[in-house]
Amino acid sequence: MANTKHIIIVGAGPGGLCAGMLLSQRGFKVSIFDKHAEIGGRNRPINMNGFTFDTGPTFLLMKGVLDEMFELCERRSEDYLEFLPLSPMYRLLYDDRDIFVYSDRENMRAELQRVFDEGTDGYEQFMEQERKRFNALYPCITRDYSSLKSFLSLDLIKALPWLAFPKSVFNNLGQYFNQEKMRLAFCFQSKYLGMSPWECPALFTMLPYLEHEYGIYHVKGGLNRIAAAMAQVIAENGGEIHLNSEIESLIIENGAAKGVKLQHGAELRGDEVIINADFAHAMTHLVKPGVLKKYTPENLKQREYSCSTFMLYLGLDKIYDLPHHTIVFAKDYTTNIRNIFDNKTLTDDFSFYVQNASASDDSLAPAGKSALYVLVPMPNNDSGLDWQAHCQNVREQVLDTLGARLGLSDIRAHIECEKIITPQTWETDEHVYKGATFSLSHKFSQMLYWRPHNRFEELANCYLVGGGTHPGSGLPTIYESARISAKLISQKHRVRFKDIAHSAWLKKAKA
């Protein structure tokens, strides 16, 4: 008997597209709505004067997760996407030295010895112990926690020691590395979660392990091509994606999500609703006041959120001699982190990330030119900063710092086009609550069972995907949130869904 159930998805970001792909493959009727003119949400492209930039994510970590999502749709990711493994993965620049980071163990050992002269025993211990942590925790991270019973599982109880509570990532790395700068090489990844390495829970020490074990990839054309590939699968399966279609509100009757109302007034009803919009924004803008009892506007305002970012996308008439990825640490990294997360103030000495993707991918800019992407972590909008007043000053500081730290002293003369996104525009234009680009903070009290559930606990027939639900922020975990919600919906309607326990990638990880 044909499956006639209709799934409405709010947002064509990575989570919404992945869920749409998985569900349309299983015969569900899928309708996705997004306010933008392009698919992808924060994974969409920015196109300017022949230059292409990724709006948000630029690192493809845990490629096996993405591969599995396509496998669950009886497809191969490589038939839709061209993957480019990066070696080195990235360059880290301190005030007094730099290091190229490799997933190749031999090259990595040589670099660590060259730069830190500390030996490589700690690195080997790190790889061995964090492999064990990953194997213990990954099955727990990728399961549903929609009920207390599902939370109190034997797997999680067995894995509790690997949470290393209440240690932070930075402190946890002390068992492997003595030098602070050596630890920074293995804990800056907390930025993927928008957190300080001194606050980020120790379980996330497995993030750098995953980089070193499985590598980092670029996708030809930018990571936005992943969104395009998922949209193609949805179309092949008969699903629909409606762009320039902003949702005004959810249709809620008797405590259940029944559909959506579009801004132009049209209403669409379905059997299940998946929310891929920023969680806190959706709860405060798409749900009428008084409906929610747990995630009220007052409750959401009091929760902890990630940092924000200042983004500078530069179309240049030259190609600089820079690696694909460069991370530059502030000269006083501790103070920089404190200013972002505690003081919520601006500083002249900041850390930043530069993607020079044209070094690896000639499809992103006209011949002889380059698309340069610059990300500067900033306080979220709890800071109260007036970004209209600060925007140009920060831009000038960023360009000055690119010259001082990376040698791009002539960069102003080579800018053909540019776009800026501030913490304020993240909130006003992109509908990111408080401009917190990595959503709710990933502290323990906002993770697992205590993060908004994939089967949303306040509304029947409503499911969540994206960084604001379990497992959390970052492309691989967002894809996992889509898998969890798609599986829950499939089980509800008695449609078979392959379990992650059968995953070839996970078996490989355990080898």
Curated annotation (Swiss-Prot):
Pathway(s) the chain acts in: Carotenoid biosynthesis
Catalytic activity: 15-cis-4,4'-diapophytoene + 4 FAD + 4 H(+) = all-trans-4,4'-diapolycopene + 4 FADH2
Domain of life assignment: Bacteria
One example of a Gene Ontology biological process annotation: carotenoid biosynthetic process
Keywords recorded for this protein, A-Z: Carotenoid biosynthesis, FAD, Flavoprotein, Oxidoreductase
Effects seen without this gene: Cells lacking this gene accumulate the colorless C30 carotenoid precursor 4,4'-diapophytoene.
Family: Belongs to the carotenoid/retinoid oxidoreductase family.
PANTHER family: PHYTOENE DESATURASE (PTHR43734:SF1)
Function (record text): Involved in the biosynthesis of C30 carotenoids. Catalyzes four successive dehydrogenation reactions that lead to the introduction of four double bonds into 4,4'-diapophytoene (dehydrosqualene) to yield 4,4'-diapolycopene.
Name assigned to this protein: 4,4'-diapophytoene desaturase (4,4'-diapolycopene-forming)
Gene name of the record: crtN
